[in-house]
Amino acid sequence: TWRIEAGGPVETPHLVNCAGAWSDRVARLAGLEPKVRIVPFRGEYHLLAPEAAGLVRGLIYPVPDPRFPFLGVHLTRMVTGEVEAGPNAVLALSRRGYRWTDVSLRDLASTLSYPGAWRLFARHAATGLGEVHRSLSRRAFARALRRLVPALRDEHLRPAGSGVRAQALGPDGKLLDDFAFERAPGALHVLCAPSPAATASLAIGEEIARVALEPLG
């Protein structure tokens, strides 16, 4: 029986951990030592200025890089008529790192103390520095978008929101792009759920439920 105290005591014979950016820590609280580590990546967005929105009438994506589970900056026309540009994928300094000023020493230490993170940095240093440049420079962000829509100009970009991706990283420095489960008696820990989680949320939920119910027959 699992007892959870947050927000009041809850007891249950079966637990499914889908804690996202904190899933590895919840697994440790349950007595496991997960092989993967959650490393936060921030995805930053811009909106196109109204005078440039007419350049995009649908979805425009770059050819994906098979080395990464990220799609690259792309353009999406929303139901409101606005056009969203992004996201990039820059290492966040906190698991709540929606801005550069959001810094958690605990989260940063968790990333930097993990050997898999250093293997990732060594393997893809140039790509990582490019993402940082696009995060800090509107001109660099716009340059990436001009590969898709050459008529876009720097001044067409308006800063918008951001999100944090709970990216599971293996000890070999590889970014996971498929489900990663770990079990404990009476518990299933979901350490990685593939993107696009919102678009495929019902199917992902069905798969997690199927795996969670397997031991029950």
Outline where the language-model segments fall.
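Flavin-dependent oxidoreductases
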Residues: 2-103
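C-terminal catalytic lobe of FAD-dependent flavoproteins
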Residues: 100-106, 111-217
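Short hydrophobic/aromatic-rich motifs at helix boundaries and adjacent loops
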Residues: 1, 17, 113-117
